[in-house]
């Protein structure tokens, strides 16, 4: 089916990236709430669930939006900029934008109109936070959702 190969590559890259650091012992249910996800998106969501350590996900009730928030320990040389370089090698057309005001350094990137991800580096503790959306109606909506939610979650990282 169209997009399946691209999706498989994205999933493989995300899994490889997630496995690059061990999980952070932070209660993700205190990092982001269903109410905050609903406020940012303007949609109703099912309760969050944790598909793996260091990640919480929310699925829209009766809709396509899916939100993921992850916090992972970051190796000394790893950063959003090294992730940007890897992404550009794998998918040269990917547009990466710097986002100010979240963590020490943050980037937003998307490979399709309905997908968006914001990743931010934090130093104390040395972790990377990622907020992702799938099922957005437009590129602008995807960027708005992950940026607004990252601004809510970011100040709580490591607290």
Walk through the language-model features, giving the residues of each.
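Cleavable N-terminal signal peptides
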Residues: 12-13, 23
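Sec/Tat signal peptide C-region and signal peptidase I cleavage site
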Residues: 19-25
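Short N-terminal segments immediately surrounding and downstream of signal-peptide cleavage
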Residues: 26-43
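Stable alpha-helical elements in mature extracytoplasmic
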Residues: 33-36, 79, 83, 142-149, ...
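Short, solvent-exposed recognition patches
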Residues: 40, 44-115
């Amino acid at each position: 089916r169209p997009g399946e190969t691209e999706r498989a590559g994205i999933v493989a890259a995300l899994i490889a990236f997630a496995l690059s650091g061990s999980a952070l012992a932070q209660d993700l249910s205190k990092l982001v709430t269903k109410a905050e996800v609903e406020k940012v998106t303007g949609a109703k969501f099912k309760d969050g669930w944790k598909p793996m350590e260091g990640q919480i996900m929310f699925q829209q009730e009766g809709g396509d939006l899916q939100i993921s928030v992850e916090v992972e320990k970051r190796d000394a040389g790893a950063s959003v900029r090294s992730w940007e370089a890897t992404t550009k090698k794998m998918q040269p057309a990917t547009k990466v934008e710097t986002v100010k005001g979240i963590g020490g350094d943050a980037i937003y990137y998307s490979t399709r109109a309905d997908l968006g991800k914001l990743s931010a580096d934090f130093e104390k503790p040395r972790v990377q936070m990622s907020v992702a959306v799938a099922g957005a109606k437009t590129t602008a909506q995807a960027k708005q959702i992950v940026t607004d939610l990252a601004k809510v979650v970011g100040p709580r990282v490591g607290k």
